[in-house]
């Protein structure tokens, strides 16, 4: 099997093929690039999933449940007006390339300029990327992806956590510091107010990310 299996990530066996047939999940282990992704992804016969890549290793994970999907949608609606005022554009999941053999598909992103149909977005064009944390993505969203985004020079990383069983919503906005690591720029829980002037003005209660 060629996929990297992080905590809770779907373990995907290579599809059965005739002996000797080329199997990208096997043959391309550790050497994935955007060019190869364009050629071989999505894998025929697999359910719809996210394909991300860390140092050439393909990472396959399920799409988010309704809680995170709604939270990401609300973040898009909250950020779109102030971001557009600066000439930026807000997007749901897209391919953000962080290196020759690295890419992520964040739950939402703010680009410095319109993507205009591009399939692969250079990390240099991303002002902010955001992830909604789920049990299957906790390690990646808290450790791996922030580290890769910081290394790529993306100035802001936003982490969103929601739970209906706990009536909990939390937003952490990280900003790239002088030493190349992310530092907490703004943070708030449901019932409080997240307020920031950078990268664009935002002021709202994280509880808005929970459905009524």
Model feature map: region roles:
Residues 1-212:
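Gly/Pro/Ser/Thr-rich low-complexity, intrinsically disordered segments predominantly at protein N-termini
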């Amino acid at each position: 099997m060629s996929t990297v299996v992080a905590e809770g990530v779907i373990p995907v066996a290579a599809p059965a093929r005739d002996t000797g047939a080329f199997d990208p999940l096997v043959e391309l282990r550790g050497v994935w690039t955007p060019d190869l992704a364009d050629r071989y992804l999505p894998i025929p016969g697999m359910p719809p999933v996210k394909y991300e890549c860390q140092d050439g290793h393909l990472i396959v994970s399920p799409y988010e449940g309704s809680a995170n999907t709604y939270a990401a949608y609300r973040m898009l609606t909250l950020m779109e007006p102030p971001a557009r005022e600066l000439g930026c554009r807000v997007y749901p999941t897209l391919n953000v390339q962080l290196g020759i053999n690295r890419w992520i598909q964040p739950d939402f992103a703010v680009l410095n300029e319109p993507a205009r149909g591009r399939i692969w977005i250079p990390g240099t064009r991303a002002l902010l990327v955001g992830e909604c944390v789920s049990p299957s993505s906790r390690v990646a969203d808290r450790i791996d992806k922030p580290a890769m985004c910081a290394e790529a020079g993306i100035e802001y990383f936003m982490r969103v956590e929601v739970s209906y069983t706990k009536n909990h919503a939390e937003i952490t906005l990280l900003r790239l510091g002088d030493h190349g690591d992310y530092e907490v720029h703004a943070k708030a829980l449901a019932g409080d107010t997240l307020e920031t002037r950078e990268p664009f003005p935002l002021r709202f209660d994280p509880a808005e990310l929970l459905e009524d």
